[in-house]
Amino acid sequence: METKFSAFFVLFFILIIAISSYYLKNEVIREFSSNEQKITGAPEFYLKNFSSKQTKKDGSLKFIFSGNEMKSFKHADITKVKFPIFKKFENNIEHSLIVSENADIINKGDQIILKDNVTLTRFPTKTRKQLKLFTSELNIFPNDDYVSSSQPIKIVQEPNIEINGVGMIYNKTENTFKILKKVTVYYEKPKK
């Protein structure tokens, strides 16, 4: 009789442990999935009217990146920016300005993708006229001085040059600018 009672007690005790383990496992899974849903829905941080500067080794300005609104999503390794402005400097003088409606910062700033009504303006110098580039998407690799696009582009250079094409690559290190496809050039001879 005693062995039956102890065997029953052991089985009952094992059953209670199994039920509580199952219950706790389900609670942990449910809590983990609800935390995961909270993480994916909200940004890790949020900034308004921000400005970020990067300098060269000698301390001179390389570029300033600013915008109206920045949201960073850790789970996607991406930062979204509204109305970004990218100012490039040469010898501490503003060389070019790029504006758009949206941008994605990828890999902690190694790549910036400007989207929606992108306008690049290269300011005039003593040897060059003002140049404007229009596209729907522009990829900037600020650490490599490399800019590219796979979208249709339009370049307008003073006084009367207009270039259209699809896709472009600008590599400052190699000092090359290539339009990839469907290039058309319109040139109007200046009036004297």
What are these regions (language model features)?
Residues 1-192:
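Mature-chain termini and adjacent capping regions
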